């Protein structure tokens, strides 16, 4: 029995090894997802993004006190004057105006169409 346990453990590890070696594929929600979603789901998605940015900015403030140029802090500044309904309208309008770009992630649209225009152009 003692000889079988190490053999079983070795077989189990070898069986799991290929699964661990596979890359993790991440799907970022895009325009196709946006178009299929109800208004409530769209609001929930954007509220989740807002919460993620707020938590990230709070973490940055605590752990990186001198660094104002983190993604979360920058995004928070760029989005602070936009409410949820306006964000839904902007994202919805962008995908309506760009039907061939439904594969563009929603986060990219939020950044480029809402947050980034709040900053002066880079020199």
Predicted feature residues:
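Bacterial N-terminal signal peptides that target proteins for export
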Residues: 1-8
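Single-pass transmembrane signal-anchor helices and their membrane-water interface zones
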Residues: 11-14
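N-terminal signal peptide c-region/cleavage motif recognized by signal peptidases
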Residues: 16-18
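Immediate post-signal-peptide N-terminus of mature secreted/exported proteins
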Residues: 22-47
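Compact alpha-helical subdomains of small soluble proteins
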Residues: 23-31, 55-123
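Short, hydrophobic/amphipathic alpha-helical patches that form generic packing surfaces
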Residues: 44-55, 112
């Amino acid at each position: 029995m003692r000889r079988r346990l190490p053999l079983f453990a070795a077989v189990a590890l070898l069986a799991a090894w290929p699964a661990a070696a596979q890359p993790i594929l991440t799907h970022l929600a895009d325009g196709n997802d946006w178009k299929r979603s109800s208004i409530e789901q769209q609001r929930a998605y954007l509220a989740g993004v807002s919460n993620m940015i707020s938590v990230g900015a709070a973490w940055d403030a605590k752990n990186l006190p001198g660094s104002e140029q983190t993604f979360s802090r920058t995004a928070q500044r760029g989005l602070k004057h936009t409410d949820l309904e306006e964000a839904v309208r902007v994202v919805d309008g962008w995908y309506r105006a760009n039907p061939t770009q439904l594969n563009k992630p929603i986060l990219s649209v939020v950044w480029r169409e809402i947050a980034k225009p709040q900053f002066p152009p880079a020199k």
